[in-house]
Amino acid sequence: RVGMHFKELSFEIEKFIRARGFVPLYGFCGHGIGKHPHEEPEIPNYLEGNNPKSGPKIKNGMVFCIEPMICQKDGTPVVAEDKWSTRSKDGLRTSHYEHCMAVFDDKVEVLSVA
């Protein structure tokens, strides 16, 4: 919602993941999207620091992607030699979703829904 800190969103994503017995993949994040596919702000799938009510806020007209990356046990990333493929350190199954959202008039529209 408009006025919410992006860290609050990160914290909610992490709580959702952990409540189901999983952990987020660290070091990767969602992002703003506009003239370029990856723009500020970065939106981690976990709370960085200890204050969710800090940092940039969601503003009317923003478009951004959230990208929950979910691991079974170990959220430590290992990037392959191709510099793109990534797995969790323990090699167990992981999952990655991406949704693009637009915020306007205090409403959110998920643009990536078919």
Placement of each model-derived feature along the sequence:
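Active-site neighborhoods and metal-handling regions in enzymes and metal-associated proteins
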Residues: 1-114
